[in-house]
């Protein structure tokens, strides 16, 4: 009997590698962080079989599929699965519903002396499992008295850095691959909404399994770049207690320069590519900056880029960063804080907030 498993919790907690035998176009729409796309059929083959299925039915589509994936095509694909299994002996495989494609892949591997477990219900069942857990976890946290802390603070105060020092934190911006502002994009694209939800659900499950008594998240908006936090989970952590990270202006300027200039430039092939991205980001907030301030910031930015090119130093970028922080981001932050009027349970500098949140874990 061919082995199957729907022990999705074990897959998540053990981070078991998965072979996704769906076509690349399906994989791109949504998958799992531990999955590797080694398809049974490529996009063109899948489309051809799909058309045949609609026109001639199931049996003819199956026959066509076997003709398309003949020995010449089959052998390198089986070899790819075998190589993956040699590297990850505990690997499992799946297709969309745990049906014919994963059964065929499983049988072909068995014919070559390799036994592999396939996911019962496939991608669809695993995805449903994760979404259900993301829905029920807030209630479970409440029932078990697990406290959520929303970490707030002005732009550049080091919230993400602080999160990375805590064992009981989840970095939503990290999962979304976006720093949550007009300048927050990375060279690598953001995950799809589906992938973000899948990864968030796994992060929450792993957090819960560690037995912490509190969860710390950055005080985010509903949308982080192009992805959004699922409503049930968002409402839950927004209802948590508030802690505020404070930092003097010059420290915030320095942190912002390191993250948005120095580290950001390292992601791009050339400094010019980064400059193009930054000019586009300035353009996205031009209306909110106002014409005069926009021109002033852009002039400081151009001067900083020229100075960096000449001296290989980054310090001149502090001038435009300081303007953005004090004249753009800080007023927006003050407005939002006044609008929310939420109780701040604790506030302090980096070390004080870190110590406080560590004690809550």
UniProtKB/Swiss-Prot annotation:
Keywords: Selenium, Transferase. Its EC number is 2.9.1.3. SMART domains: RHOD (SM00450). InterPro entries: Rhodanese-like_dom, Rhodanese-like_dom_sf, SelU. It comes from the Bacteria. GO terms for biological process: tRNA wobble uridine modification. Gene3D superfamilies: Rhodanese-like domain (3.40.250.10). GO terms for molecular function: transferase activity, transferring alkyl or aryl (other than methyl) groups; tRNA 2-selenouridine synthase activity. It catalyses: 5-methylaminomethyl-2-thiouridine(34) in tRNA + selenophosphate + (2E)-geranyl diphosphate + H2O + H(+) = 5-methylaminomethyl-2-selenouridine(34) in tRNA + (2E)-thiogeraniol + phosphate + diphosphate; 5-methylaminomethyl-2-thiouridine(34) in tRNA + (2E)-geranyl diphosphate = 5-methylaminomethyl-S-(2E)-geranyl-thiouridine(34) in tRNA + diphosphate; 5-methylaminomethyl-S-(2E)-geranyl-thiouridine(34) in tRNA + selenophosphate + H(+) = 5-methylaminomethyl-2-(Se-phospho)selenouridine(34) in tRNA + (2E)-thiogeraniol; 5-methylaminomethyl-2-(Se-phospho)selenouridine(34) in tRNA + H2O = 5-methylaminomethyl-2-selenouridine(34) in tRNA + phosphate. Residues 12-135 form the Rhodanese domain. The active site is at 95 (s-selanylcysteine intermediate). SUPFAM superfamilies: Rhodanese/Cell cycle control phosphatase. It is an enzyme of class 2 (transferase). Pfam families: Rhodanese. Involved in the post-transcriptional modification of the uridine at the wobble position (U34) of tRNA(Lys), tRNA(Glu) and tRNA(Gln). Catalyzes the conversion of 2-thiouridine (S2U-RNA) to 2-selenouridine (Se2U-RNA). Acts in a two-step process involving geranylation of 2-thiouridine (S2U) to S-geranyl-2-thiouridine (geS2U) and subsequent selenation of the latter derivative to 2-selenouridine (Se2U) in the tRNA chain. Belongs to the SelU family. Monomer. This is tRNA 2-selenouridine synthase. The gene is selU.
